[in-house]
Amino acid sequence: DSITFSELYYKLEADDHDNPAFIQAGNGVILSMYTRHSRKDLFINRLDATSDFTFKGAQLIHPWSDEELVRFPRMTMTYANPFRLEKENDRIYCFGRWTGFKPNMMWSDDHGQTWSDSKVFITNYPFDSNNRPYVKYFSDGQSRIHIVFTDGHPRDESTNSVYYVYYENGAFYK
């Protein structure tokens, strides 16, 4: 037995905002998704587990839409949190802090080959481009994605609350 190393991206920063997240797509391919801290880059690498266990070169994607940028005018890419839901025909969702400095979601119905435009799903009104909720995600892998989030950064919110919602079958529930 031997151990083989595979470099995801030669410029990957040593920053917890950029940590790669891994998910097995419904077709057996392993996806690695990651960002660079507060840049405009979201990367996807693919590993076909039936081959030589080497990740293919990084694919750069830009999931935001001009329409969302008009509504939420700030663009940074930080965090990548992918989840696959079996009961949604293996749809892969990816969450992160992107358009508007807010939690966004996008999805893929073809094992990560193509992606929807991202959508902001948590924001404040009136919109404040400096406010950024902190979010944690968890999924059962079947039908539900659990989401816990705050009003904003702990140092910026004098009364910072914690909220819980879950996503299931096309809707959010509290």
Functional labels for PLM-detected ranges:
Residues 1-174:
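Extracellular, repeat-based ectodomains that mediate carbohydrate processing or recognition
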